[in-house]
Amino acid sequence: MSLLFCHRSPVVEVKAMDQLPSGSRIEIHATAFDPWSELDRWGGDAAACAQFVGRVRGTGMDGLPLQALELEHYPGLCEQRITAIALQLQRDHQAGRVLVLHRVGRLAPGEPIVLVAVEADRRGAAQRCCAALLEELKHKAPFWKREWCGDRGTWLSGNTAL
């Protein structure tokens, strides 16, 4: 049984996590993480590994300079939704282990917000699964974003397009 840590509830049990390949990780972080160190720590010996690191943009949706991005999530449900998405895509693309780290809280422009990595026997499977996992994560995981420009915070109604 895998245990996940998130910023509000100290430990969340996600049963579907047991169905992902051993070594897969899905975590919500309230503090900064170094994506390159996390990738090194995750490591593996698969023939292919595709990864994506997303950072907070420097401008808001209205084009103004962004001071911060605030992210909220639904603890427990968020991890379950991401795990279900990862499991389905891992099967669809015949991929191996997956790594999904996502930040919550208040982030400054340039800070890493998400890391998605996928291993597979072939680069095509790893790349397709990684891209699909990122898109599903952006549109189906219960995260809420609030942009801070100056002293004004604005909740976003949707995610940016590809």
Task: List each language-model region with its residue ranges.
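N-terminal, polar/charged subdomain of small-to-medium soluble alpha/beta proteins
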Residues: 12-113, 119-162
